[in-house]
Amino acid sequence: MLTLCLSLLLMITNSQITDKKEKVMKFELIQLPYAANALEPVISKETIEFHHGKHLQTYVNNLNNLIQGTKFENATLEQIVAESDGAIFNNAGQTLNHNLYFTQFSPYGGGRPTGALAKAIDATWGSFENFQKEFVAAGTGLFGSGWVWLAKDKDGKLSITKEANGSNPVAHGLKPILGFDVWEHAYYLEYRNRRPDHLNALWKIIDWDTVGKRY
């Protein structure tokens, strides 16, 4: 009988530990769809390792800890960004930002968009080149840390948004399509204070197939 009781107690304890782990690990660090050195020389292996493995991991860990016991415990990232504020918003925004950021690149990227996204860009800016210039100018002119995004509204209309710190177009009811990170940790090892050079170089590694599917 004693052995049976101890076994039941152990099972309950293990179950509680498992449940706790599941809560803590609601959001996980995304796996990169390429090797850490695959985007060189545009983005170095060292930057990828720190940016993805350290910075993003910290945002994910913080978010998991912050949402425990709140109404956001079972929400999606998009729901959290749309409805939260303060520390939860900041860490959810940065998790969403970086998930979209890292998965929009490919060592075989570059070129230009095609299909519906290409037509929408041409209709809005006149040409892909005009869009690129305005997008880079927006990122260059953003004061301090943040993001520049290509986003669309519910009718498919495109716009360029400048998001301070960890914000995301989702917070304004828009869908993020393409995002460039202008926090210094995203580019300082390679480009120092040359933010425009960093932004212009990123076009060489954009996976337009992935980005186009977001539209």
Region locations from a protein language model:
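Short, Lys/Arg-enriched N-terminal segments with co-localized hydrophobic residues
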Residues: 7-24
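Sec-dependent signal peptide recognition
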Residues: 1-6
